[in-house]
């Protein structure tokens, strides 16, 4: 099964959306295998957003993501990287489809509730920033046979 990294950003935590967001992924049939509630260090944030170093918004992005607690999660499921991206909606909430997480809850591109890995390679890199291998729990979901062939 494929894994991805999802992070509820400080605005999602402050607005009390953690339960709602987790519920959406559980109801879709995805399996939570790791979760942490933490405040990112500047070093973690800079490592996470390394691809944006040198861009005009980099400093503000790092300052924002370390401004409050986040929920770091590892989810598992069939095609989870692409499906979770669809569930989140476009990065810019103004372009996010109604019913997506960002289309429903986000207002501003700089406060867009959630981050999700954009590829399996990104997921692997991002998960390594937040989780040790022994922090991801292998478990059998009894209803898995009802979700996928």
From Swiss-Prot:
InterPro entries: NDK-like_dom, NDK-like_dom_sf, Nucleoside_diP_kinase, Nucleoside_diP_kinase_AS. One of its GO terms (biological process) is UTP biosynthetic process. It is found in: Cytoplasm. The active site is at 115 (pros-phosphohistidine intermediate). It is an enzyme of class 2 (transferase). The keyword Transferase applies. One of its GO terms (cellular component) is cytoplasm. HAMAP family: NDP_kinase. Homotetramer. Belongs to the NDK family. NCBIfam families: PRK00668.1. This is Nucleoside diphosphate kinase. It comes from Heliobacterium modesticaldum (strain ATCC 51547 / Ice1). The lineage of its organism: Bacteria, Bacillati, Bacillota, Clostridia, Eubacteriales.
